[in-house]
């Protein structure tokens, strides 16, 4: 595994570097959307030590959200794994927090096959409504607009 090869088997170090790199990307600017905010958990959860509730995971993720809010960016809600595992990125548990922080979101499937482009889309909209979102962002005629859910 690459965790063993590149991070000496230390999942916590991998998580730290992932979020450090995400923060650097946000700071560098030139973007509207932060995607794959916590997609690291897709593979990270294969390790027994991996725990979303632990400070070593939660705090750097929340620091990224703080920076997203500060910079006025939006977060991608990625539905790629909804059909297989009923998972979104960021995790469903974080949607309410993003709503509380008034961080706008856009829904994307990140699919590589045209017939899967809408997989999980309706479910993501439903979960966003449950989390208190009233709209998502969509690119309309070259401009980001809030579209009611």
Where are these regions (language model features)?
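Charged catalytic cores and adjacent phosphate/nucleic-acid-binding surfaces used
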Residues: 47-149
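Extended substrate/RNA-proximal surfaces in nucleic-acid metabolism proteins
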Residues: 1-71
């Amino acid at each position: 595994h690459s965790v063993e090869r590149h991070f000496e088997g230390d999942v916590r170090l991998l998580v730290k570097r992932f979020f450090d790199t995400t923060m650097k990307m946000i700071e560098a600017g030139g973007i509207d959307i932060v995607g794959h905010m916590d997609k690291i958990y897709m593979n990270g959860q294969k390790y027994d030590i991996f725990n979303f509730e632990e400070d070593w995971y939660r705090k750097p993720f929340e620091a990224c959200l703080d920076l997203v809010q500060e910079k006025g960016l939006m977060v991608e809600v990625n539905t790629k794994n909804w059909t297989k595992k009923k998972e979104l990125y960021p995790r469903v548990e974080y949607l309410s927090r993003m709503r509380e922080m008034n961080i706008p979101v856009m829904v994307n499937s990140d699919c590589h096959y045209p017939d899967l482009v809408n997989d999980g889309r309706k479910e993501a909209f439903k979960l966003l409504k449950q989390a208190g979102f009233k709209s998502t962002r969509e690119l309309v005629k070259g401009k980001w607009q809030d579209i009611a859910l």
